[in-house]
Amino acid sequence: MRMIDIIEKKRDGHTLTTEEINFFIGGYVKGDIPDYQASSLAMAIYFQDMNDDERAALTMAMVNSGDMIDLSDIKGVKVDKHSTGGVGDTTTLVLAPLVAAVDVPVAKMSGRGLGHTGGTIDKLEAIDGFHVEIDEATFVKLVNENKVAVVGQSGNLTPADKKLYALRDVTGTVNSIPLIASSIMSKKIAAGADAIVLDVKTGSGAFMKTLEDAEALAHAMVRIGNNVGRNTMAIISDMNQPLGRAIGNALELQEAIDTLKGQGPKDLTELVLTLGSQMVVLANKAETLEEARALLIEAINSGAALEKFKTFIKNQGGDETVIDHPERLPQAQYQIEYKAKKSGYVTELVSNDIGVASMMLGAGRLTKEDDIDLAVGIVLNKKIGDKVEEGESLLTIHSNRQDVDDVVKKLDSSITIADHVVSPTLIHKIITE
């Protein structure tokens, strides 16, 4: 088999066999196939696309290029959730203890964040003493005992994806549905999930700006999952404004605690209940979405979800008293109110710009080596559709420096106030095939 033949075959619009895809991925990881041939094939895929069988084969070739996490010692159906990312996306922090409270095992492998704010692990590390460096045996034991544990990414998972992703980044082949879908799904499958719930974001603060693109990606990932024996479904949710009100690590953790108490923002609560209901059904803990939703609401109202979060924090060395004493979380030195320059209704909150503003305060990383300030960030006091009076606070800047003129300038271009009301949509579609 020759790589040049595989490139020409895809260039001319033909279907690649599983053997050809395995030959490419295997050879590329070993270094037998050079970057220039891999980038040539990536560009051919970009223009000629792949069918469902090719996408599934590419995903599994990347899964098999490295280690797979074995979660077979954990009792029950392991359901994982993946979000394509957004601003203020606190769902994992709420979902993990919430679904665990209704007996769904959550064995979560998470990373650190690049971009607007930290990842799930950075947010949890805002809790004094919390650690994620636990061995596999302890991880399995914690999930079996308490139904939830979070561990840092370790081992040699999907090395082919890491290599191909870096190549796509510099060869103009990032925005290819088969390449994005196989990249995301290979990581989820290698992490040991039996079933997968996907939260595909669309809008100004999302990777997929249009609903059409988000749908195409959601369908692609759901089909890959179902084709390789993992029950998979996707929700397409809106990221035209940040989710919830908090953007920043300790601030988002505080918001997660409020949500588990039943006092969280409406949009975050609704998205968590929608995603959580799907997870509960896939884990065979409820027969219908309505029944699953009722179980989750009861877990919040009874305090079981909050109690689960406390035990989870304690199990991983953290100070669980932060649940009742949020002032023990990292606090920024200055709170600066950003006020409305006129009266009207909020019609636009550009997620990316608000994310960048929080990053300028120190809440996110530009490179893996950067330190982040867990205390800083932005809290939205108004969301799209809210009425606002001139001089009223639109948002609060939590900062460890007094001069935030650069941040204010960024925010000036990210908020629009008009004289008409806009009603935002939160959940656009649910995709099951």
UniProtKB/Swiss-Prot annotation:
K(+) binds at G88, T90, L243, A246, E255. Phosphate binds at K81, H82, S83, T92, K108, M109, S110, T120. Substrate binds at R168, K187. Pfam families: Glycos_trans_3N (PF02885), Glycos_transf_3 (PF00591), PYNP_C (PF07831). Transmembrane segments: none annotated. The keyword Ion transport does not apply. It comes from the Bacteria. Disulfide bonds: none annotated. InterPro entries: Glycosyl_Trfase_fam3, Glycosyl_Trfase_fam3_N_dom, Glycosyl_Trfase_fam3_N_dom_sf, Nuc_phospho_transferase, PYNP-like_C_sf, PYNP_C, Pyrmidine_PPas_bac/euk, Pyrmidine_PPase_CS. Gene3D superfamilies: Nucleoside phosphorylase/phosphoribosyltransferase catalytic domain, Pyrimidine nucleoside phosphorylase-like, C-terminal domain, Transferase, Pyrimidine Nucleoside Phosphorylase, Chain C. This is Pyrimidine-nucleoside phosphorylase.
